[in-house]
């Protein structure tokens, strides 16, 4: 009986090896199970075509191999009664936080100008942009990790989430009024919101107009 089914397009042999190190007795399959799909209990998916899970009628859990589950939830044939889990991988969180920090510092020190026109802009002549407040929309696993990194480097961090949250050294806001507060006071705005029906198109022109002049 195959207990765990891995996607064939995401380094399945490495995943299989790691899982077997944790549980040598685990029965693992790779790719679509055609002979006995009813015996599959757990699946790992990522950006799967709609209907991929149709044959697996006895699933106990679905794991999305990423931090967002929007690709799975968009499948109209996703079994509604089966719990869905997502990864909370510290390495992936660090990569995202470093990317965000790089983007903020590149803008703050006007590095793009130096890269595009190095011969016209003497090194050190650009003005350091003012503003030290980073607003983070979405205080989940990724948002919290990013907040910690910005705090370590002396940034002031404001965060917004749908429901109330408390994070050390972070000014936390929630709800519509809280969103307006973060939008209108952030020098740098970062969105780490999950893509759902409630967050899609949240940052529209109306929201952008609430941001302070010169915000990035």
Go through the PLM ranges and name each one.
Residues 1-40:
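N-terminal glycine-/charge-rich "phosphate-binding" loop or analogous flexible N-terminal tail
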Residues 7, 46, 65, 192-195:
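Short, well-ordered coil/turn residues at beta-beta hairpins
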Residues 28-39, 50-53, 169-185:
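Short acidic low-complexity segments
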Residues 41-115:
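Phosphate/diphosphate ligand-binding glycine-rich loop within oxidoreductases
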Residues 81, 130-134, 205, 214:
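Phosphate-coordination loops involved in phosphoryl transfer and adenosine-cofactor binding
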Residues 113-145, 172:
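Glycine-rich NAD(P)-binding loop of Rossmann-like domains
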Residues 152-169:
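NAD(P)-binding Rossmann-fold cofactor-contacting core
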Residues 164-216:
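Rossmann-like adenosine-cofactor binding region
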